[in-house]
């Protein structure tokens, strides 16, 4: 099906479709999913600011927030962005006092800097600017 669609597009649209597909996959790699408790600890212990997005697949506001986090990760090269599925890693969520989703927690060197409960992109942007100075 994909080949049929690509072949039926006009040449200039074909390149747009390919470029858009490539760009989306490049951006998606910027918010990395946590694979284990050890992986989580390693990532939040970094010298740079780490934004931890606690989410769940069933959470509507979490889905709304995802593209904004991907865009922020592109714009803030000095910060790292990770995602923790609160259903899969309930122990990590509990350890961090996460009782509402989405919750974003900012860390540096393993220490919590700040926390945002809810899909508040403006506050996250301003906190990133504050802690990256």
Curated annotation (Swiss-Prot):
InterPro entries referenced in this protein's UniProt entry, alphabetically: Thioredoxin-like_sf, Thioredoxin_CS, Thioredoxin_domain
Transit peptide stretch: 1-29
Residues with site note (Deprotonates C-terminal active site Cys): 53
GO molecular function: protein-disulfide reductase activity
Deletion phenotype: Leads to auxotrophy for arginine and cysteine.
Disulphide linkage map: 59-62
Any Pfam family: Thioredoxin
Site positions (Contributes to redox potential value): 60-61
Residues covered by the Thioredoxin domain: 30-133
Annotated keywords: Disulfide bond, Electron transport, Mitochondrion, Redox-active center, Stress response, Transit peptide, Transport
Active site residues according to the UniProt entry: 59, 62
Localisation: Mitochondrion
GO CC list: mitochondrion
Swiss-Prot/TrEMBL induction comment: By aluminum chloride and ferrous chloride.
One of the protein's GO biological processes: cell redox homeostasis
Family recorded in the similarity comment: Belongs to the thioredoxin family.
Described purpose of this protein according to its UniProt entry: Disulfide reductase which serves multiple functions in mitochondria, protecting mitochondrial components against thiol-oxidative damage as a thiol-disulfide oxidoreductase, and supporting urea cycle and respiration in mitochondria in a manner independent of active site thiols.
Assembly, per entry: Interacts with arg3.
Protein name per UniProt: Thioredoxin-2, mitochondrial
Organism name: Schizosaccharomyces pombe (strain 972 / ATCC 24843)
Gene that produces this protein: trx2
